Amino acid sequence: MTTTEKALPRLKQRYREEIREALQQEFNYANVMQIPGVVKVVVNMGVGDAARDAKLINGAINDLALITGQKPEVRRARKSIAQFKLREGMPIGARVTLRGDRMWEFLDRLISIALPRIRDFRGLSPKQFDGTGNYTFGLNEQSMFHEIDVDSIDRPRGMDITVVTTATNDAEGRALLRALGFPFKEN
């Protein structure tokens, strides 16, 4: 019987060895538990057109599963809205919550592979923090992820990505994400 060693994700290892110490020195924390870290990453794909054509949600589910390596949860409408021809319970989106090693591997692929592949990418906006150190940004198509075959895309779909951290304010969250390698625009 062979023993296999589980490799630590590259970004997680960098966080533990370098980034935590740098943040501790920058913010002068009294306790190591105060150092901000990443809790989870939520990837959401809203498919409003699925209200008219139910088959469109399957493409979003397949794309999200390929990108994240996890089966998405189908999000359904909470209430009916006549103007949008929407009934309660209709599928209108898909969502994946990533934690642990999958989260670190996704962030690594996002920062090092996907974001640099965006055409005319000038950096992420540093103003999209929510006040408690969490960061949300949107991508307008799924083709920048190398898991998606460009020829098999039935239609471009955007997605929202939320990075939830243990930071208590935006300055700590921004420092953590910048240290992890998020390319923020310089104002």
Curated annotation (Swiss-Prot):
Pfam families: Ribosomal_L5, Ribosomal_L5_C. Keywords: Ribonucleoprotein, Ribosomal protein, RNA-binding, rRNA-binding, tRNA-binding. It comes from the Bacteria. InterPro entries: Ribosomal_uL5, Ribosomal_uL5_bac-type, Ribosomal_uL5_C, Ribosomal_uL5_dom_sf, Ribosomal_uL5_N. GO terms for molecular function: rRNA binding; structural constituent of ribosome; tRNA binding. GO terms for cellular component: ribonucleoprotein complex; ribosome. Signal peptide: none annotated. NCBIfam families: PRK00010.1. This is one of the proteins that bind and probably mediate the attachment of the 5S RNA into the large ribosomal subunit, where it forms part of the central protuberance. In the 70S ribosome it contacts protein S13 of the 30S subunit (bridge B1b), connecting the 2 subunits; this bridge is implicated in subunit movement. Contacts the P site tRNA; the 5S rRNA and some of its associated proteins might help stabilize positioning of ribosome-bound tRNAs. Belongs to the universal ribosomal protein uL5 family. This is Large ribosomal subunit protein uL5. The lineage of its organism: Bacteria, Bacillati, Actinomycetota, Actinomycetes, Mycobacteriales. The gene is rplE.
